[in-house]
Each structure stands twice: as C-alpha cells, then as structure tokens.
Amino acid sequence: MSNSRIKNGFGLVSNTVLRDPELSIREKGVYSYLATYADGHDNSLTVSVNRIASECGITQSTVKRILESLVNKKVITREKRMSMQSYRTVLLK
C-alpha cells in the first residue's frame, strides 16, 4: 500500500450498496462519503450536514433528503445525540 494511501486513508463500501438498483447515484455517493468517516468497529460516525454538503458539492437540504431516504431504505440509522445538536449515524450494509 502506498504511503499516500495510508496517510490519506480510505473508506470501504459494501458491494451490496454499490450494486443496489434501488439506490440513486447520489445516495450511493453520500453513503460512500459517510464510509470514509465510519469507525472500524461498529461503522458509526458523526459528521455534520454542513460538512457533507460542502465536501460533496450539494446543498444541505439535499443532504438531509438523501440521509432521510437512506434511513427509510434501511441502509443507515441515525439517532440524535444527547445534549448536542448532532446525530450518530451507523452504516448498516
């Protein structure tokens, strides 16, 4: 593995997600982005809607719609964190 790859890291995305015809390319893209933040032990992460929007080049409202769709399709779960205005997200597939 090259040093730049180790230094910059990477995310793993399940073929189940990438090959799912029920998921749009935007849903697959945001899911793949989330995978770069996922903890290796339980696939959980916390990243702001603002950061997702900024780094993916889409609006915050689009991010919110995509996250809601991924929850409805049971690809991720999201739970509001106590005492914070953030969500804990878990990748399910």
Short names for language-model regions:
Residues 1-8:
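N-terminal leader segment of winged-helix/HTH proteins
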Residues 8-22:
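Short, Lys/Arg-enriched N-terminal segment that forms or immediately precedes the first helix
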Residues 19-21, 25-26, 36-93:
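Winged helix-turn-helix DNA-binding recognition segment
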Residues 29-33:
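Pre-recognition alpha-helix immediately N-terminal to the DNA-recognition helix
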